[in-house]
A protein has these predicted regions:
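Glycoside hydrolase catalytic-domain context in secreted enzymes
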Residues: 1-317
Length: 317
């Protein structure tokens, strides 16, 4: 449940390779899968076959979360594309975000997806940053209002949105993506975390994506303070945290707070990252537990959070 199947492992261009799926997944239940290379027409059939395999061929028969990227429309040929968030933010009309999410939900359902990696409510404070278009703007309150509307639009239509990118992100040093955001506690809470707090406290959001950069050179995806003390204990978030792609592996390959996969997995999971996306450090956890080097309770907590959301969204029905 705490691992993610990358589409590159099981697809041959536009075709799902059932042998690859069998070899990769085995009889193990997985948390999530995406189909980024697929056209919209091919998505529904492929997602159905993957779900059928997970329910009928794995030991526990737990449904998998089918995941799509959709900052301004599903990232699949044939889907409708809408203006980027920075354009919507410029209208100062948050209701547009709700309408956008409602219409995107129709596309997602038709393609077999239940989880969407959106909305992005990063507060942008450096125009040199290459991801400015993903956000609604520079004002925390405005970003929060748009986030509330977009999340509500998805939830009303049976799609689980994912709030991203949690942790200071939109003002990296020199405007460089992945660079650390430098600020004190006041700016952290009043600027960068404010829209996330607004959405968590005013919607039924069940998924949050942690960033792969750092705050004051401490990786956000290894920060117990951000992911547990603030998000869960202070704000009352009850869902799961999904790593930005490669964030766990970056702890060893980029930020160098971990020397290997085992240390990266321990740092991320104990901080509060429930699901590792696009890397395989969490594979080391089974051996760590068998050797008595890691407490299984952290895996139980993460699995429980993910299963709870799957039940709430009706995946078992």
């Amino acid at each position: 449940q705490i691992r993610h199947i990358h589409s590159s492992k099981i697809f041959n261009r536009q075709e799902l390779d059932m042998q690859k799926l069998t070899d990769w997944a085995g009889n193990t239940s997985w948390g999530f899968v995406e189909g980024f290379p697929l056209t919209g027409d091919n998505c529904a059939k492929s997602m159905y076959l993957i779900q059928k395999y997970m329910v009928e061929k794995t030991r526990l028969g737990i449904p998998i979360f089918t995941v799509a990227e959709s900052l301004h429309g599903a990232v699949h040929d044939g889907a409708t594309i809408y203006p980027q968030n920075i354009a919507l933010g410029s209208t100062f009309n948050p209701e547009l975000a709700r309408k956008k999410a409602q219409m995107i939900s129709d596309d997602l359902h038709s393609m077999g997806f239940r989880q969407v990696l959106s909305p992005c409510i990063d507060v942008v404070r450096d125009l040199r940053w290459g991801r400015v278009e993903e956000s609604y703007g520079e004002d925390p309150y405005l970003c929060g209002l748009f986030g509330i509307e977009e999340v509500s639009g998805y939830l009303e239509n049976g799609i689980s949105p994912m709030l991203k990118h949690y942790g200071p992100h939109g003002n990296p040093l020199s405007g460089l993506n992945l660079a650390s955001v430098e600020c004190g506690l006041r700016d952290l809470h009043e600027i960068y975390l404010k829209p996330f707090e607004m959405v968590v406290k005013n919607t039924g959001i069940l998924a949050v994506m942690s960033t792969y950069n750092s705050w004051n050179h401490i990786p956000n995806s290894a920060s117990h303070y951000l992911l547990t003390d603030i998000l869960r204990d202070e704000w009352g978030f009850k869902g799961y945290v999904y790593s930005d792609w490669g964030a766990v592996a970056m702890l060893k390959d980029f930020q160098h707070t971990a020397k290997d996969d085992s240390e990266a997995a321990i740092q991320a999971l104990t901080a509060g990252v429930d699901l590792e996306a696009s890397s395989n450090c969490y594979w080391a956890l089974e051996q760590l537990i068998e050797q008595g080097r890691f407490d299984e309770k952290y895996v139980d907590l993460a699995v429980g959070r993910i299963l709870r959301v799957k039940f709430e969204l009706g995946l078992f029905e």
